[in-house]
Amino acid sequence: MVEEPRKRARPGRSPAPAGRTARPRQAEVARLAGVSQATVSLVLADKRQGPAISEETRRKVLEAARSLGYVPDPAARRLAAARNNLLGVFSFTATFPTDVQHSYYPFLVGVEREAAERGYDLVLFTGSSTGGAGAAGPDALSRVRLADGCLFLGRHAPVEELGRLVVDGFPVVHLGRRDEPAGLHWVGADYVSAAREVVGHLAGLGHRRMVLIREDDEAPASTDRERGFAEGLEAVGHGSVFRSADPERDLTPERLRRWLADGVTAFVAEETDTGAAWRALRRAAADAGIECPRDASLALLGSPPADLADGPEPTGFDIPRTRLGAAAVRMLAALVAGEEATEPLVACTFRPGATSGPPPGAEDH
């Protein structure tokens, strides 16, 4: 089950119904100009923030709009001009993560503090809300339009529904890096550099063969961690990646013993909202009788789940969740105000921990 990262296919767009005679839509302008709907929205709204758009592309969009007789919906314009000082926060969970032990809770602390500082109230949505992410169809996220803009949390936000909000010009920010949909604003942590630093620490202890355990999805946060893992090993050793949709089932004590027999001396797990990879690694190591760091070193690319915080502190890094929440609100407030919206990647903090040490036999050399 050692695999290379897989590239994601970009989703297509459904064609507009044939024979329509009503007001031309942005989708038709996009087809005629040969660009995405998000690009049309940004050009027609004369928004300069977000992805750079060349003057040639702007010219094509404006010419296509003129030739089709496109006129912006005046009702939509009036709605865009109305502000009520409400920011939405949408969590793709069944209930809102207000438990202090939930991994999202520190994000929400930063969101609440920054929103209060800027004079905004918050309206909270969850995946089980009426009209929320659990609904089907083009209006799955429609209720967030009650707010001036919305911040989204979660690894598995629906691309199509988010894309519809972006195309409509509704201010949206995703907490965590996102490649899709086009034009979506996001804030994120620098997981590449953080993962590279953790691997560099292990290499400095003498480890040359490592395995990364990650869940089998394509979340950008996982991709960034894997990239940092690979970059950290480029000049010093060899690494492989174990991907599983169910790490607690597939990462067995026998598998760990085989890796150790093959010369692997360090195991690295990614952090996710489920904590599945780290849970599986800890359990398998304990069941295999592996004592860390005497027999092998363990590292976690993130922080352990709250229910596992009583064990030895893992080598790894801490994510600045409160700072990320505040950065997301700053970006969203800028979008609502029609201003430039940029936020740098936020650096993580290396954590030496107590689960790493020199590889077995290193003291003999």
Which residues does each predicted region cover?
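Structural signal for hydrophobic
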Residues: 87, 172, 229, 295-296, ...
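Residue-level recognition of beta-strand->loop/alpha-helix junctions
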Residues: 126, 176, 214, 244-245, ...
